[in-house]
Amino acid sequence: MASAEPRPRMGLVINAKPDYYPIELSNAELLSHFEMLQEYHQEISTNVIAQSCKFKPNPKLIDQQPEMNPVETRSNIITFLFELSVVTRVTNGIFFHSVRLYDRYCSKRIVLRDQAKLVVATCLWLAAKTWGGCNHIINNVVIPTGGRFYGPNPRARIPRLSELVHYCGDGQVFDESMFLQMERHILDTLNWNIYEPMINDYVLNVDENCLMQYELYENQVTYDKQCSEKRQSQLSQDSDATVDERPYQNEEEEEEDLKLKIKLINLKKFLIDVSAWQYDLLRYELFEVSHGIFSIINQFTNQDHGPFLMTPMTSESKNGEILSTLMNGIVSIPNSLMEVYKTVNGVLPFINQVKEYHLDLQRKLQIASNLNISRKLTISTPSCSFENSNSTSIPSPASSSQSHTPMRNMSSLSDNSVFSRNMEQSSPITPSMYQFGQQQSNSICGSTVSVNSLVNTNNKQRIYEQITGPNSNNATNDYIDLLNLNESNKENQNPATAHYLNGGPPKTSFINHGMFPSPTGTINSGKSSSASSLISFGMGNTQVI
């Protein structure tokens, strides 16, 4: 049996191939657009910044998510969203804007873990329908062009619901009706305010949106250069005339500038995608993040770039924090992002350069930390040894023996004061009272010894000085009488003051003679402390017999 003839295709059949968008036309459109922007430059910049600040996510509220803790879950959910944006072939900037919608939604609603993919996929769908892009430089509205031209921008690509259902669980978890319900829920939560400025408005200039046009122009320049070289080689073989090299130099300079421009556009797009993973950047405004992106580009490319919009200047501290966050994000770049950008012109050398710089910086910080630790150990080592406790030391200077009350003698040198430093107590802040359990034999009714019954130590000190002084003849008899009196009243003597009569004045050691000496009114007065002064001296005097 003869094979059946193929049935003709029904419907409109288009065999036309898209043409390249004319470069002359795109240049004229860009020039006209720049002239218009110059007239309303300040008003446009003010409005863009105001809208960005108005719709800024709140990281403090995102931190309160019970199941979607950003520290634990953000990396995984953003990686899934990026992979979804790659397989659905959405245009540049849609991924970052969908992350922005997700953060704004998390600032107002609780997101369950099993519904996280549904939320981020719906945010991607909304962002693609809002900022899907088209194949025109100036227009921002999604308008189908019919595929007549190739370039200068990628065509609009809005994911189908069937694609989202397939990539979010192959129809076993979510269906199309759930995406429609979630879309309406997100719109109601955000009050239908999903049309906000993008970070591309700050980082990418108008002419940098037409990367396809630059790549097309680069291919054309390369092809013209090859044809010109062949033509010049044929002319040089046919004739001995010298060939003018000035056209070659101009073409090489133009080609080099074109390559640098393409690398710059690729780096900007790469850093925009890297910033989407960094949760710490939510604390800053979009224009501050854009300044950080330009700072890291200028640092590693030795160029001077800035935003086209008029934006406020960022403080050095904020700019340094953003720069450090971006560098950490590049060092720990996700594998899915690396797979996409490893073949893009100029991105992989930039990543390696940042990693080398970060590694070198970590080494320097480690060396500085080790030096600081060694210095601390050297300083904490005592520079001189303390004096032995048995060494002779300077006695305490004499002070007034008068006290305001008999029970509380505030004189710092009085041994019969309740705050005496010669008695051991539990704490220098809370002094302990003297306890006398001895009975005085000649006291009335056998009462215990009172504080007033004790002989004042300062009076003993003056008697001692009189004995050893020039007029010691008259004072010797008084001193002998005092010895006899104390011998008869030995049971009522304070052991802390007995050494005045037996061995001379007390020996007090003053070790801390530095800038911060220890207080003399506490029990810790005679103890050395290396924390109070780094330099301590042990001083003594000759004991008088």
Swiss-Prot record:
Alphabetized UniProt keyword annotations: Cell cycle, Cell division, Cyclin
Gene3D superfamilies reported in the protein's UniProt record: Cyclin-like
Compositional bias (Low complexity): 389-403
GO CC terms, sorted: cyclin-dependent protein kinase holoenzyme complex; cytoplasm; nucleus
GO MF, any single term: cyclin-dependent protein serine/threonine kinase regulator activity
CDD domains named among the record's database cross-references: CYCLIN_ScCLN_like
Chain segments carrying region Disordered: 230-252, 383-414
Positions with biased composition (Polar residues): 404-414
Other comment: A dominant mutation in CLN2 gene (CLN2-1), advances the G1- to S-phase transition in cycling cells and impairs the ability of cells to arrest in G1 phase in response to external signals. Present with 1270 molecules/cell in log phase SD medium.
Function: Essential for the control of the cell cycle at the G1/S (start) transition. Interacts with the CDC28 protein kinase to form MPF.
Name used for this protein in its record: G1/S-specific cyclin CLN2
Gene: CLN2
